[in-house]
């Protein structure tokens, strides 16, 4: 049997991390079994579904490189198929037309609740033989079995049973002729030959209804697996108050897709005590029986740690392709300065996100208007004038411009003036970067370049001279 899974989001908003984890688990299960992964857009909620949300879902899936083998399919383009199946069910007696008014249904609901009963349709039209005009408004209901129970072996939670007496005859077609969500899902899974449905635990109550419809259609019933929810670190359901929840917001905040995928796969699944997984390892090791039944807590600090790891572990050239977007957001012109791959090597240890990297690299490419006030006050003092002049001249005299030779020039300056490296290094750092912190000074000066470094040292010397004149 060919394994076939699906990810079926509703395009009413962005792709959130819970949906992304579900998509990842479905994708991994299919890839682990050499199967196929289908993308289906469940856009039957015409009022809330938007083209922007569809685009956001696609963007998130593409950014995470969760490529699909079929689709995207759109439910709104399959209404003829759904209605044909409903008409067939009406003929076979597994569905019936319901003419009950909203007023009657509301009164029935209030009466049942007053008795402490679970609100459910009482089946009045199921057994009615009244004649109705063809154009009289009605819904179509599924004739749910009235006896027995539905049992399915959830691949994460084990056997789950629902009594058919708990399930009422759900509406499968509205008065406007549009099919309902639970019915469309069933026909889609049947037509698309889905073998395994991996989805959130909020769908557990839909499962027995969908199984009963599948059986009425004499269609194969897929295997179900319901993934637990994701909570914030406070134990409450993950929401915007916990920070970013949109996949693309994590991109915007400077995370690598590898970091988010690695974090999401471990958010409810484990393979021994391994923390770092390549995509190939995820595919190789992923199984549903290793997915936890318990809710997972989202920990941003752990995700940040993973992101820092991947910034430094992945090839700098690859990281640079993602950094480029953030550089563009900061409007930094990188034509005059180090290659972005070299920048990743320079700043990787210091920066936990690509956004932080982009925001802290401007001095490599553009001259700054002024020095950081605190750093200048501390290090660009008259006592720094001679070390800066000497190191400037030694940098200018370097014939082979390498980081190693820059280091020798700084060391030679300290030796010549008989001062510690800090007496040369700190004023030089403030002079060439404008601030008191940077990567190792030799590689920083080397990356900034000889001409620009000397110009900035001269600017710092002018700043010191002006400061002397003001005293």
Curated annotation (Swiss-Prot):
Binding locations of Zn(2+): 98, 100, 125, 127
Superkingdom of origin: Bacteria
GO CC annotations on file: cytosol
Residue sites binding ATP per the record: 240
Pfam families named among the record's database cross-references: Anticodon_2 (PF19269), tRNA-synt_1c (PF00749)
Residue span of motif 'HIGH' region: 9-19
Record-listed E.C. numbers: 6.1.1.17
Requisite cofactors: Zn(2+)
Main location: cytoplasm
CC cofactor note: Binds 1 zinc ion per subunit.
InterPro entries named among the record's database cross-references: aa-tRNA-synth_I_cd-bd, aa-tRNA-synth_I_codon-bd_sub2, aa-tRNA-synth_I_CS, aa_tRNA-synth_I_cd-bd_sf, Glu-tRNA-ligase_bac/mito, Glu/Gln-tRNA-synth, Glu/Gln-tRNA-synth_Ib_cat-dom, GluQ/Sye
Transmembrane regions: none
Location of the protein in the cell: Cytoplasm
KW Electron transport (keyword) present: no
Primary role: Catalyzes the attachment of glutamate to tRNA(Glu) in a two-step reaction: glutamate is first activated by ATP to form Glu-AMP and then transferred to the acceptor end of tRNA(Glu).
Assembly: Monomer.
Name the UniProt record assigns to this protein: Glutamate--tRNA ligase
């Amino acid at each position: 049997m060919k394994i076939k899974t699906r990810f079926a989001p509703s395009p009413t908003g962005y792709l959130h991390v819970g949906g992304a984890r579900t998509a990842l688990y479905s994708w991994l299960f299919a890839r682990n079994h050499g199967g196929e992964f289908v993308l289906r857009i469940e856009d039957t909620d015409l009022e809330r579904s938007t083209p922007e949300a569809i685009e956001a879902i696609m963007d998130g899936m593409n950014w995470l490189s969760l490529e699909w083998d079929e689709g995207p399919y759109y439910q709104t383009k399959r209404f003829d198929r759904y209605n044909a199946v409903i008409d067939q069910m009406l003929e076979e007696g597994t569905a019936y037309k319901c003419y009950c008014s909203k007023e009657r249904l509301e009164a029935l609901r209030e009466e049942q609740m007053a008795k402490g009963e679970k609100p459910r349709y009482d089946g009045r039209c199921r057994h009615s033989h009244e004649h109705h005009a063809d154009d009289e408004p009605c819904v179509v209901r599924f004739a749910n079995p009235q006896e027995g129970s539905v049992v399915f072996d959830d691949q994460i939670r084990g056997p789950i049973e629902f009594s058919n007496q708990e399930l009422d005859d759900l509406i499968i077609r509205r008065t406007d002729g549009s099919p309902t969500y639970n019915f469309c899902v069933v026909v889609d899974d049947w037509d698309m030959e889905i073998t395994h449905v991996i989805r959130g635990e909020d769908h557990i109550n839909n499962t027995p209804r969908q199984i009963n419809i599948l059986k009425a259609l004499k269609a194969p019933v897929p295997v179900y697996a319901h993934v637990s929810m994701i909570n914030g670190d406070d134990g409450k359901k993950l929401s915007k108050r916990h920070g970013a929840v949109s996949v693309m917001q994590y991109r915007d905040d400077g995370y690598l897709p590898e970091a988010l995928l690695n974090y999401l796969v471990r958010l409810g699944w484990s393979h021994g005590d391994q923390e770092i997984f390549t995509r190939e390892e995820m595919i190789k090791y992923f199984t549903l029986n290793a997915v936890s039944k318990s809710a997972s807590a989202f920990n941003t600090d752990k995700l940040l740690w993973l992101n820092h790891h991947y910034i430094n572990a992945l090839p700098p050239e690859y990281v640079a392709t993602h950094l480029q977007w953030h550089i563009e957001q900061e409007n930094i012109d990188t034509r005059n300065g180090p290659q972005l791959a070299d920048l990743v090597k320079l700043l990787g240890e210091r920066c936990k996100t690509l956004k932080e990297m982009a925001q802290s690299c401007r001095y490599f490419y553009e001259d700054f208007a002024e020095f950081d006030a605190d750093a200048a006050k501390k290090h660009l003092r008259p006592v720094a004038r001679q070390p800066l002049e000497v190191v400037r001249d030694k940098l200018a005299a370097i014939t082979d411009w390498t980081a190693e030779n820059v280091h020798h020039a700084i060391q030679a300056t300290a030796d010549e003036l008989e001062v510690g490296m800090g007496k040369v290094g700190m004023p030089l750092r403030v002079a060439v970067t404008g601030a008191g912190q940077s990567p190792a000074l030799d590689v920083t000066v080397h990356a900034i370049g000889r001409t620009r470094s000397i110009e900035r040292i001269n600017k710092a010397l002018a700043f010191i001279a002006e400061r002397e004149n003001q005293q």
